[in-house]
Amino acid sequence: MKYQLEISNITKSYGDLKANDDVSLSIKSSSIHALLGENGAGKSTLVKIIYGSLMPDTGLMKWAGEKYSPKSPFEARENGIAMVFQHFSLFESLTVEENIILGLDKVGLNENFTEEILKYSKQYGLDVNPQQVVGDLSVGE
């Protein structure tokens, strides 16, 4: 049987805490799945690994039979993988500008709009360096 996404023996730890411990699963193309579990079970961590915003400590992923190891959400998007957020969110590992570009790409606009968006951001009180990593911003920014 052919699978679109295969995950084998994924492990991700935060210090002594194992968020994912030897997780394996296979997903067929055009199928719908849900990750269910208690708070702290590692669901979000696994999704972030699939989406490329976190790297696993160990394990292997395959997309359409080929090794798959996205280094960013941009690479994941090239394979048609995107994330729909329950609550508004930014990718903490990306810069302000990269977050804007990712959003523009999603709605079919190009990077030329980035400068204009940053101009309006300043006008409305969001005056940040576009090259600053979002995870380094204060909560109010």
Describe every region a protein language model picked out:
Residues 1-141:
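Glycine-rich phosphate-binding loops of nucleotide-dependent enzymes
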